[in-house]
Amino acid sequence: MGGGGTLVDGFRRLFHRRTASGSNQSSNAGEEAASSDLEVADDPDLVALRSIRIRVPKRKMPLPVESHKKNTVEMEFFTEYGEASQYQIQEVIGKGSYGVVAAAVDTRTGERVAIKKINDVFEHVSDATRILREIKLLRLLRHPDIVEIKHIMLPPSRREFQDIYVVFELMESDLHQVIRANDDLTPEHYQFFLYQLLRALKYIHAANVFHRDLKPKNILANSDCKLKICDFGLARASFNDAPSAIFWTDYVATRWYRAPELCGSFFSKYTPAIDIWSIGCIFAELLTGRPLFPGKNVVHQLDIITDLLGTPSSETLSRIRNEKARRYLSTMRKKHAVPFSQKFRNTDPLALRLLERLLAFDPKDRSSAEEALADPYFASLANVEREPSRHPISKLEFEFERRKLTKDDVRELIYREILEYHPQMLQEYMKGGEQISFLYPSGVDRFKRQFAHLEENYSKGERGSPLQRKHASLPRERVGVSKDGYNQQNTNDQERSADSVARTTVSPPMSQDAQQHGSAGQNGVTSTDLSSRSYLKSASISASKCVAVKDNKEPEDDYISEEMEGSVDGLSEQVSRMHS
């Protein structure tokens, strides 16, 4: 298909037939571009593609609120003055050990948003530092394909506040759920999804930032095919003088999407290629509907990677700095690479050629995001004007990473970040004002009471039963999946075309397991495991785990304790012990 160029023309014609909706989308996109640091106009090709709908699991609407309760439940969520009156709360959409998330409407723009209350931010300095890092990165990385912080509520006290209220744009679902709910995604979907991810990654890497945890659950999605990368809780800004060991000691990796060099500390300096590998794994999962490398442990992960790619060349082995990892791979039985055309049958050859470049075992052989965007696979989409870059982030922004922080240090740094969303107060702060928080009315006190009321009703089910979601990362809405995590519905053999894509707005029938799971939830029976381990999987503000996650027999996450390992070299020790 040459990258789907002919169907793009068809999408464009479809777009012109929908001039009314298209103009609305264009105007909304223009407002977005005006409010960000980027001047990225929506190209007609992209707008046309986004008019082709995909299935996203839908949330039930909350039960109607009785008129005499409306004031206490919704209208008085914020104070009657200042910033708080800007948002009208609708319902709680997630709750966990970190806090609670509510869906709301911005009364000035009509936009739906997610307001996330993070409880006791400073209870653990490490988690508070991660929140600081993510708030800062999401402020600095403003891009159409990266989730955006709309606002952060000003706390009532500069030196004593404990909770944070962050306002995000509200997305419908995530890519993990989209893959499971759609068994008829087309090559045009695959192409457009990958294009957006690489466009975001080009911008992130130009800033010298590594995301380090790219996976389908950390990519938000809407039914118009729009994707946004979220969860920068593990991201790092890379500077040339930063020691590699320090840079990676707190790395909590998602094994299934982890680059091979991270499975054993293979190379002396890590590069943006670690994110490129993750994108390759995600692209392969889009093509097949299943994870490409579902390793059960580090050794198994390396085994299944080499089963597909073959054993590394002698040149690659010679560059591996870790002796144990080098010896393990050297003694591995010789494997020949499996042709991608055999692994991914009936797939566009251009897509497979690009996938091979994304999944090269040696990081130096992987394409950069910019190089991948120039690949012939994107001939019908590529446009440098809508693929912005940026200057590297200043090292001064992350000077706090170089010193040991106290709770008060982190509180002051987070307060400074919050003021970025309050320009008048920021000016006072820069002048050295000590009482600035009392010059500007804060709605947080009333906000706390309203959240407490909503949480109580949420637990009692008075505003509608919360939807089941196995992996809940907010501000994403919660959706249901089958027990085994995969869509069991048999695919139809019908021809997939632009017209069929346009009709994919209704979720497919659930599998038998999913139906049983759903009926159990309706009867008030739940099987969630309320473990702190599930809650603490992520301290991210844009994608924290908010409900319990049932233990998986083959977990995709490895938890690497800084105290236990000291450095990422400990992974090689694990490889050696498990192999012996």
Swiss-Prot record:
Keyword Nucleus: yes
Record note on modification: Dually phosphorylated on Thr-249 and Tyr-251, which activates the enzyme. Phosphorylated on tyrosine residue.
Main location: cytoplasm
Keyword field: ATP-binding, Cytoplasm, Kinase, Nucleotide-binding, Nucleus, Phosphoprotein, Plant defense, Serine/threonine-protein kinase, Transferase
Catalytic machinery residues: D213
EC number, UniProt record: 2.7.11.24
Modified residues (Phosphothreonine): T249
Residues forming coiled coils: none
Reactions listed under catalytic activity: L-seryl-[protein] + ATP = O-phospho-L-seryl-[protein] + ADP + H(+); L-threonyl-[protein] + ATP = O-phospho-L-threonyl-[protein] + ADP + H(+)
Amino acid composition bias (Polar residues), ranges on this chain: 20-29, 502-543
Record-linked InterPro entries: Kinase-like_dom_sf, MAP_kinase, MAP_kinase_CS, Prot_kinase_dom, Protein_kinase_ATP_BS
Gene Ontology terms, MF aspect: ATP binding; MAP kinase activity; protein serine kinase activity; protein serine/threonine kinase activity
Listed Pfam families: Pkinase (PF00069)
UniProt biased composition (Acidic residues): 554-566
Domain of life: Eukaryota
Protein purpose: May be involved in defense signaling pathway. Phosphorylates EREBP1 transcriptional activator in vitro. Enhances DNA-binding activity of EREBP1 to the GCC box element of pathogenesis-related (PR) gene promoters.
Comment on protein domains: The TXY motif contains the threonine and tyrosine residues whose phosphorylation activates the MAP kinases.
Subunit structure: Interacts with EREBP1.
Protein name per UniProt: Mitogen-activated protein kinase 12
